[in-house]
Design a protein with these regions (language model features):
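Gly/Pro/Ser/Thr-rich low-complexity, intrinsically disordered segments predominantly at protein N-termini
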Residues: 1-192
Length: 192
C-alpha cells in the first residue's frame, strides 16, 4: 500500500485511475493498492453470487415488486467521511431498500452500505484491515464480513461491537439484515 502526501477530495477521486492498481481515499490521502489476486476475485464473486441468488429467491417467493435492496461488487466506492474525505471500496456491498432506494448515482454516494464484505489479500496488514472495518462501522454499516483465504476463516464485525471468528464448520449469516441468508465457509473456500 502506498499513500500520497496531499489532500484529495471524493470528487477529485472520481475518474482518477492508476493503470493496474486499486485506489481508495483515507482521510484525504490517496491509498494505492495492488490488483486483487485471482483467489481474491474468486471469493468476492462467490459471496456476491450467493447474496444475489438469495435476493432473487426471496423476491420470487415473496413476489416483491422491488428487491429487498441493492448489491454491488468490483470495489464500489462509498464516501464515508468529509473534510478530510474518506472513500472506501469493499469487495462486495449490500444496501437495503430502507437505506438507499434511488437510482444508482455516478461517483461515490455519501453513505455506507448495510453490509461490507472485505476479502483479505496477502499484502493486507491486520491494522489496515481493522482501520477499514472501523471506518465502515463508524459510518453506519451494520455488518462487516472479513474473509481471510490464507487462514480459511471469516470474521464478522457488527455495529453493536460484537465480533465472531468463523471457521470451516461455520457459516456466514445475513442475521436480521438478510434473514435466511446462509453461506457455509466450507462451501465458500471449497474445502474438503
Amino acid at each position: 500500500m502506498i499513500a500520497a502526501r496531499y489532500d484529495m477530495t471524493a470528487e477529485e477521486l472520481v475518474g482518477y485511475e492508476i493503470p493496474g492498481k486499486r485506489v481508495e481515499l483515507v482521510r484525504g490521502q490517496l491509498v494505492v493498492r495492488e490488483p486483487a489476486s485471482l483467489r481474491h476475485g474468486e471469493l468476492s464473486l462467490r459471496v456476491g453470487v450467493a447474496l444475489a441468488n438469495h435476493l432473487a429467491r426471496e423476491r420470487e417467493e415473496q413476489r416483491w415488486a422491488l428487491t429487498r435492496g441493492r448489491l454491488a461488487t468490483a470495489d464500489p466506492g462509498f464516501t464515508l467521511a468529509r473534510s478530510p474525505d474518506t472513500v472506501r471500496a469493499p469487495d462486495v456491498a449490500y444496501l437495503s431498500r430502507e437505506r438507499y432506494s434511488g437510482p444508482m448515482p455516478e461517483g461515490y454516494p455519501e453513505l455506507a452500505p448495510d453490509l461490507a464484505v472485505e476479502v483479505r489479500s496477502r499484502g493486507d496488514r491486520a491494522g489496515e484491515v481493522l482501520a477499514k472495518v472501523a471506518d465502515w462501522l463508524s459510518a453506519g454499516t451494520t455488518l462487516v464480513w472479513v474473509v481471510d483465504p490464507a487462514r480459511e476463516v471469516a470474521t464478522v464485525y457488527r455495529a453493536d461491537g460484537t465480533v465472531a471468528v468463523l471457521g470451516l464448520d461455520d457459516a456466514l449469516s445475513g442475521e436480521a439484515l438478510l434473514p435466511g441468508f446462509v453461506l457455509s465457509l466450507r462451501e465458500l473456500f471449497l474445502a474438503e
